[in-house]
Amino acid sequence: MGKEKTHVNVVVIGHVDSGKSTTTGHLIYKCGGIDKRTIEKFEKEAAELGKGSFKYAWVLDKLKAERERVITIDIALWKFETPKYYVTVIDAPGHRDFIKNMITGTSQADCAILIIAGGTGEFEAGISKDGQTREHALLAFTLGVRQLIVAINKMDSVNWSEDRYNEIVKETSNFIKKVGFNPKAVPFVPISGWNGDNMIEATTNASWYKGWHKETKEGKATGKTLLEAIDAVDPPTRPSDKPLRLPLQDVYKIGGIGTVPVGRVETGVIKPGMVVTFAPAGVTTEVKSVEMHHEQLPEGLPGDNVGFNVKNVSVKEIRRGNVAGDSKNDPPKGCDSFTAQVIIFNHPGQISAGYSPVLDCHTAHIACRFDELIEKIDRRSGKKVEDSPKFVKAGDAAIVRMIPSKPMCVETFTEYPPLGRFAVRDMRQTVAVGVIKSVEKSDKGAGKVTKAAQKAAKK
């Protein structure tokens, strides 16, 4: 096996008919974690149903059904390998809560793959009328995704026309530049997801195609296929050197063991013997043990979903949405208010001070009041366009001071990204997204410090 490969997370975006499912399905099918038995089973069913040509998208539909049926997602279904990386597709697009998932999502995407339909008329529809592609690209950029790959799909439907390809590259470059990406750093790859052309092996249908190239701070890279473009992603840095932040997903009471909070380590490291503080609950105690998949761990690192056993704390004292951190190293605190850059997506009316929607930030789900609209800004450059606007509407971006209706723990986006981005939910949809610029933390003295914590401190 040799050295473990680095893990990278990609998110696939694009218009609803761009062929995202087919393309994603193809990569997973050819390079992925689906075992051969499952594939044979699907192929047999496909043949019986007269879907004999076996469309990759159909595999993906089957996987989606499995994924929705099985509560513990078999994430192998959403992984594939490149020579350098293990790649996880964070969200199968087309998902209703795509936007919310990208924000509160299990992980920060390291790279976005934008799939563009190259068919006559399709490209134009995807980019112009339907704002969805733009919205998703803007969202990825706002949430700190700086690496992008553009796959120009359905090239078979335009006979691999060089003119058509160049036209789309030009238009798409303008489009992504408006969003904030640098086109020089973006590989453009012509593909046919349906036929699997130029996805894994270089196409033989386009003698004119000399390959893609990109230039980033890390240097230059070139290649032919989509797989090579994914393999050329700059390796992500994982924040294990930062102080611990672990938002709780659940808290269990387990007979014979006691209280076991569960969650994903976002930054830092959690170890047995560490004294942790839960915010905003204000409870401090010692970590007895850390485990993942029913195995004891010497430490939990960023990205690990862990359960940890804590002493002298009842299930009633801590809950989902609380954040655990190291009591000796920038411990987390609750906040009285925070200031954020908010982009309004799809709200039918005008939003003014006093608006109180629900915020989803990491695992917390709490109503917050838009207390003051400080300024309206240009959503690309971040420059101020208006002081103290009376209201904001869909398409606007603003700096807003927000007050949570009950104690919550958030951080600035620059220091702790997963705790500094949020979705604004109202009318059963995501109406806005935000990144937190500053936090007014509440200094409500130390809360409960357990005997175990005091003992551990003396060691």
UniProtKB/Swiss-Prot annotation:
Region feature G3, mapped onto this chain: 91-94
Subcellular location: Cytoplasm
Sequence positions bearing N,N,N-trimethylglycine: G2
Function (record text): This protein promotes the GTP-dependent binding of aminoacyl-tRNA to the A-site of ribosomes during protein biosynthesis.
Record's keyword terms, sorted: Cytoplasm, Elongation factor, GTP-binding, Methylation, Nucleotide-binding, Protein biosynthesis
Residue ranges constituting the tr-type G domain according to the UniProt record: 5-240
UniProt-annotated stretches for the region G4: 153-156
Name the UniProt record assigns to this protein: Elongation factor 1-alpha
Spans traversing the lipid bilayer: none
Gene Ontology cellular component terms for the protein in this record: cytoplasm
HAMAP family xref list: EF_Tu_A
N6,N6,N6-trimethyllysine: residues bearing it: K79
Modified sites of kind N6-methyllysine: K3, K30, K316, K390
GO molecular function annotations of the record: GTP binding; GTPase activity; translation elongation factor activity
N6,N6-dimethyllysine: residues carrying this PTM: K3, K316
Database matches in InterPro entries: EFTu-like_2, GTP-eEF1A_C, P-loop_NTPase, T_Tr_GTP-bd_dom, TRAFAC_GTPase_members, Transl_B-barrel_sf, Transl_elong_EF1A/Init_IF2_C, Transl_elong_EF1A_euk/arc
Region (G2): 70-74
